[in-house]
Amino acid sequence: MDKKIFMDYLPEELMEFGIQPKFRTKQLYQWVYRKYVDDFEEMKNIPKDLKAKLKKEFIINPLELINHEIATDGTEKFLFKMHDNHTVETVLIKMKDEEIKDGKIKEAKYTVCVSTQVGCKVGCAFCLTAKGGFVRNLSAGEIVAQVWWMKKFKNFDENKALNVVYMGMGEPLDNYDALVKAIKILANPDGMNISPRRQTVSTSGIAPKIKRLGNENLGVNLAISLHAVDDELREQLIPLNKAYNIESVIDAIREFPIDKRKKVMFEYLVIKDVNDDIESAKKLVKLLNGIPSKVNLIYFNPYPGTNFKRPDDATMKKFQDYLINKGIMCTIRKSKGMDISAACGQLREKEINK
């Protein structure tokens, strides 16, 4: 692609391209990220010569929306095409409806599940994304644009709050530089102004980069795709564990700066007759000792060709009750978007006519 992607850049970087004075970058950010304008010609307070320069050098929005599906539970999945015809999927989940309380409208709460790569290198045994292999990293702008589309599409300035989770296609920490820049762009007060406290990075456990992310002091939340409590099983489920075993991941988490009001989220995908027994729950309690933790139990979502099976509700409840009785906050994630393949582990690149 000959032109640069506007959404790839922080305001100070735009100034290096000759976009001066400083207030111009603020105006541009507000047009793009507050008014959702993706055509420089529509920016009324930008000088004509600057518009011409920008049109020649930049495209604003790098994603083309080519498909939109809505599940029976209201979960929405978006398929985007990029300049090279590769595609990524983004999922929007409504967590809480608007409500009227004391005569005031309380905002609805949504979570957008953002992709960071086309495909994935990690190769988790239970995840459909990795079946097609790794294709490429997304740029910061291609990550940011997924959130931009959600805010534009759903008019999020009207009684709607949006949280961002980097839990879509790909391993976020394997695309580290673009991830960090995207976090900063989303948080910029002249733009979408999504605080890092409302952004969660989910990782399968690249221990050195967990430490590096902590040293950035961005204030983001951390989620760990744990899924097993011993290395032998975790290596079968998550091959990355051969490079970074459970102990190294836990050590990195202990060094990660956690807001006193927050906890580290541990995602535990429960697979029938694999990791759903009480002995696994006991080991999990021991493993998380001393870490401010919240465990999110996730039903395995079957897909064509897998031998893994979904656990029953009684087993999930028994596992949850054991953790709670041991003082660990634990929730069971309600699988959303299963009928449109938008649930955990079901996202993948789609073939399109090229």
From Swiss-Prot:
Record's catalysed reaction(s): adenosine(2503) in 23S rRNA + 2 reduced [2Fe-2S]-[ferredoxin] + 2 S-adenosyl-L-methionine = 2-methyladenosine(2503) in 23S rRNA + 5'-deoxyadenosine + L-methionine + 2 oxidized [2Fe-2S]-[ferredoxin] + S-adenosyl-L-homocysteine; adenosine(37) in tRNA + 2 reduced [2Fe-2S]-[ferredoxin] + 2 S-adenosyl-L-methionine = 2-methyladenosine(37) in tRNA + 5'-deoxyadenosine + L-methionine + 2 oxidized [2Fe-2S]-[ferredoxin] + S-adenosyl-L-homocysteine
Chief location bin: cytoplasm
Binding site for [4Fe-4S] cluster: C120, C124, C127
Residues annotated for S-adenosyl-L-methionine binding in this entry: G170, E171, S202, S225, L226, H227, N301
Active site: E89 (proton acceptor), C344 (s-methylcysteine intermediate)
Organism superkingdom: Bacteria
GO molecular function: 4 iron, 4 sulfur cluster binding; metal ion binding; rRNA (adenine(2503)-C2-)-methyltransferase activity; rRNA binding; tRNA (adenine(37)-C2)-methyltransferase activity; tRNA binding
Keyword Transmembrane helix among record annotations: no
Subcellular location: Cytoplasm
Note: Reaction proceeds by a ping-pong mechanism involving intermediate methylation of a conserved cysteine residue.
Protein name from the UniProt record: Dual-specificity RNA methyltransferase RlmN
